[in-house]
Amino acid sequence: MQVSVETTSNIERRMTIGVPAQEIDQAVQKRLQETARTVRLNGFRPGKVPMSVVKRRFGDSIRQEVVGEAMRDNYIKALQEQDINPAGWPKLEPKTMEEGKDLEFVATFEVLPEIELGDLSKINVEKPVSEVADKDIDNMIDNLRRQQATMKEVKRKSKNKDIVTIDFKGSIDGEEFEGGSAEGHRLTLGSGQMIPGFEKGIVGGKAGEELEIDVTFPEDYHNEDLAGKDAKFAITIHKVEEPQLPELDQEFFKRFGIEAEDEVAFREEVKKNMERELKQAVSNKVKNDVVDGLLETTELEVPAALVDQEIDRLRQDAVQRFGGQVDFQQLPKEIFEEQAKRRVKTGLLFQEVVKKNDLKADEAKVEEKIQEIASTYEQPDEVVAHFNSNPDQKAQVESSVLEDAVVDFVLGAAKVKEKKMKYEEAVQAGQPQR
């Protein structure tokens, strides 16, 4: 086997491989003989078909099969000989494949980029500093109660947090516009679901009343045809309902999987959950800043093959989240391209930090993270046992711990600035980037 490698770009290689004609022709002949023993053709007894007939009928297709297998096998051997690590599968193109001639083919493929990490000291990280205050717990419990609320129709004037059932019809300069009308729409007043001024204009209205309100679409409204324009809405209120909040009793606590004797114990459990959420949010915010910093300080060309693989994973995840009712390949690749590129770049950069600094997943931290995950379940011991008896599951935790080690390493060199935030602000800042 003869091999030559040409560098066509930073991450693309063109490999020309030659395979002796004797090797290909022998494989073709062997396949023809096997076919002659098993093929059934009209006018011939099984196993008695002349080789000339078999070759005339099946020779071309058999040679194509043999050449395809030879290209795959010799490509893999060539990679090992040349000590090349490809990113994704190659494009294989035969140049010569005639009988009696050496097989020559070209494999075009991408390789993982050589990465020169940027100056980590130029990375800026903003770390939220926050705590769970009593007011935050009050708000959380109020939200939990509203999730479990039953609705009661009332005849009074509507107010914030009521749910109104309305018909509305919008117009601009006297002309109705697409998407500006609905019937039987249920709206929680004060939720911010509608454009500014819409919900406020309904507050104080009663069932059976007809209202007319003037609003202005925000300048950054997603529909450019409506952005910044004044509109008029004619609204009919059909029903006003107020939420009936459940009592804070043991039955209510159990709906959230919490065994608590009284409200004090329930608040303590809610606080623990909120503190866990806050801790994760801070970790996410710091990690997002680290990733942003690595991407900004390091030039990196990513192999298209890896991006395509990640796009397919994202499309499959999206299909699963929405019930698996469609083939993931029906989802446009463009929707996921930027997200896929970020993920691939992040993975390559993290791998480089690990390799250059010989970072490891600390076993004690792996066990600590497993215990932390298990503590959120009713049977934590069973969850721990599950992780310890399932190598793939444990490997995911080890990967997460190794990512944390990368973040910690970068933080040691980066400029870290702490910023005081309220609980809700910190949680919002720590929303993970997909």
From Swiss-Prot:
GO terms for molecular function: peptidyl-prolyl cis-trans isomerase activity; protein folding chaperone; ribosome binding. The keyword Isomerase applies. Its main location: cytoplasm. It holds the Pfam family Trigger_N. HAMAP family: Trigger_factor_Tig. Consists of 3 domains; the N-terminus binds the ribosome, the middle domain has PPIase activity, while the C-terminus has intrinsic chaperone activity on its own. This is Trigger factor. It comes from Marinobacter nauticus (strain ATCC 700491 / DSM 11845 / VT8) (Marinobacter aquaeolei).
